């Protein structure tokens, strides 16, 4: 209902998806891609994309990368296709990796938007003749970058937490021998280090 109220002109008007044509334009208003048309072709290609996503003979991360590309290429809706593709990809990655890595992938894609769009352009180029290698390698690099960043961040925060916890246990004024007090102090410490907003009471 909220989507219907806020953006009624971009609602799907076909049986499942959009029924009319849609163009993807550059900031200079130049058409760089046309979404699949008509809706019957959209449905057919989405079914094919889902078949690839569920094909367990293909490594999982490659399936996710291919589906992400197919969704963007098909462009089943009038608007919000990129956001939906990132959401689906983040969800799929969270199932098999970790939610922190999945969210970081989405952040990186948004941060390096030109690099991301170039992956689609290179894959769509006539010279590649449908070769999905650029989008697969590019997506895997985003995942690798997100994984390394998340690992580095968590490692640094954990080391900070361990040092702070050691300092806390050596503070005479705190009754850390009391289990309840120690547990509360530990929760507050974790919130201060691992959360951007700390903790509220």
Where are these regions (language model features)?
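FIC/Doc superfamily catalytic core
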Residues: 1-201
């Amino acid at each position: 209902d909220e989507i219907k109220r806020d953006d009624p002109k971009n609602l799907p008007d076909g049986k499942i998806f959009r029924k009319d044509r849609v163009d993807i334009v550059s900031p200079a208003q130049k058409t760089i891609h046309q979404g699949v048309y008509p809706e019957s072709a959209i449905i057919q290609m989405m079914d094919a994309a889902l078949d690839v996503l569920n094909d367990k003979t293909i490594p999982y991360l490659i399936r996710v990368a291919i589906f992400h590309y197919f969704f963007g290429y098909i462009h089943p809706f009038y608007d919000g296709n990129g956001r939906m593709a990132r959401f689906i990809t983040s969800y799929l990655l969270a199932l098999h990796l970790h939610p922190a890595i999945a969210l970081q992938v989405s952040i990186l894609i948004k941060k390096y938007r030109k690099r991301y769009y170039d992956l689609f352009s290179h894959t769509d180029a006539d010279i590649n003749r449908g070769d999905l290698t650029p989008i697969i390698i590019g997506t895997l690099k985003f995942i690798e970058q997100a994984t390394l960043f998340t690992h580095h961040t968590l490692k640094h925060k954990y080391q900070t937490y361990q040092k702070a916890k050691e300092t806390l246990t050596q503070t005479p004024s705190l009754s850390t021998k009391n289990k309840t007090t120690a547990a509360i102090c530990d929760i507050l410490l974790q919130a201060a280090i691992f959360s951007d907003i700390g903790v509220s009471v």
